[in-house]
């Protein structure tokens, strides 16, 4: 293992260096050149236990000794140097090594300060001056032993893997953390070393990780979760995760969870206002549904996967938002009803279920134009009401506990009645807007197929009207005039993928209109101004002259010849805006947005299409609809 050091002659010292700068200026350590490289054919690599034993054998080869200079001093004298801005740059600064060490003479009152100066180098003048000034001891040679524990996962793998792999593909240390589980997605080139990689990662995150898994290529075709292989640690796949002020628990083997979508979850959660109704068609374990319910939204959440449904129900219960069938009306706003059925069936079912339940309407007095401000005030008011109600309940409980003695009961009743604060009105006494009988938001978060499920909305109100009565439904639709938080038409938020590198918005809207069975020339079709294509599109267009592989998917696109000459972002957007003008007369459907979520692959992006479902779709004649 080598240590790169600096001295005053190197110009590394800075009289103004702070502790923060010192921490950021860690000195690089590397594995000794003597560490044996693996070939991938070692028998121990074929099993989890074998890889663990091999790693234990290899750890000793990472050990190396270094002779550096140090300063001997008493414990009381430490602040004289550790707070000296001129000395700080010369203190030894490497990961996992304290620059304050016990003195080798064994005196418990003595310490040494390790210096970032090799024994063979001259002692910096500023250090010598400090030693003379404070009458300290200069130790010309101190042997420092560094090893496996002082290196990162990257450095260890760089030393162990074949140079042909390291130079071409780097090292596989990137992973996602889900609770106590590290989730890797290893390339095939690392397959012979997968168990070793798992044990190295586990050894570097002791106390945080207990399980390391690798995602396999196979995917469950019905429920869309990946098979995985245990690489290291415990076979414990039940993860506990905190997100959006909620706690989640689930078996990672049988459900889908992506911690990288946290920001997207919160973005949509914030679109749901208190007392609105949200129907989550593909809810999974509840990353949208549970936090939304906790923030005061009425939620109906569904997932076809029985394991997801089980976790969804449990997570709603853990976070105290579960509404069970047959239970009394909740004593607070917001709650979650969980179901397990097909997504298309759920769309129709949820509309009827909301109508039957008639969720509590929004309390009056929070109807200002600044929705965010009013919603925050409403949530604060609800929290205050719950706290005061809880205080009253505790006082009443104390009375009941004291009923064993007349004297104790009388005293408790007296304490309860004297200077008792006014208790907020109960749920039934709060003046409210009418009951919520319609869904305000639908969320469909299964990007591989969610767009296909939009056909479930065709004729949905026509179907509902045959059950509840058309006139009653029409009257309910007019309530938005009294309560601005009511959507006259439901907002649909559908996640999807697009592989169109040039016009992703047009690609998404074309598929959405087809699923909704909206004719291409219909005035109510979904339309939107073009959005910026992925950044790699422009980079690829510039590289195409070299026939680079990164741009091959561009040149194979059917519209490549139309856009290949547009290398700059400005020229490209001008061109597609002109196409939009000719195609849609530059019309953009009101309340429609297409939000970029993340890159899934160089030629595959995830988006969220949000739009208000056209009334022509909801009231379509189902007898002539393509919906099945």
UniProtKB/Swiss-Prot annotation:
Catalyzed reaction equations: guanosine(37) in tRNA + S-adenosyl-L-methionine = N(1)-methylguanosine(37) in tRNA + S-adenosyl-L-homocysteine + H(+)
Q: Where does S-adenosyl-L-methionine bind?
A: 265, 303-304, 342-343, 445
Which GO terms of the cellular component aspect does the record hold? cytoplasm; mitochondrial matrix; nucleus
Keyword list (alphabetical) reads: Cytoplasm, Methyltransferase, Mitochondrion, Nucleus, S-adenosyl-L-methionine, Transferase, tRNA processing
Query: What InterPro entries does the entry give?
Result: MeTrfase_TRM5/TYW2 (IPR030382), SAM-dependent_MTases_sf (IPR029063), TRM5-TYW2-like_MTfase (IPR056743), TRM5/TYW2-like_N (IPR056744), tRNA_Gua_MeTrfase_euk (IPR025792)
Subcellular localization is given as:
Mitochondrion matrix; Nucleus; Cytoplasm
Name its GO BP terms in alphabetical order.
mitochondrial tRNA methylation; tRNA N1-guanine methylation
Q: What class of enzyme is it?
A: transferase
- Give the EC number(s) listed in the UniProt record: 2.1.1.228
Query: What's an example of a GO molecular-function annotation for this chain?
Result: tRNA methyltransferase activity
Its chief place of residence is: mitochondrion
Q: What role is this protein assigned?
A: Specifically methylates the N1 position of guanosine-37 in various cytoplasmic and mitochondrial tRNAs. Methylation is not dependent on the nature of the nucleoside 5' of the target nucleoside. This is the first step in the biosynthesis of wybutosine (yW), a modified base adjacent to the anticodon of tRNAs and required for accurate decoding.
Instruction: Give the matching HAMAP family.
Output: TRM5
Assembly and interactions?
Monomer.
Q: Which family does it belong to?
A: Belongs to the class I-like SAM-binding methyltransferase superfamily. TRM5/TYW2 family.
Report what the protein is called: tRNA (guanine(37)-N(1))-methyltransferase
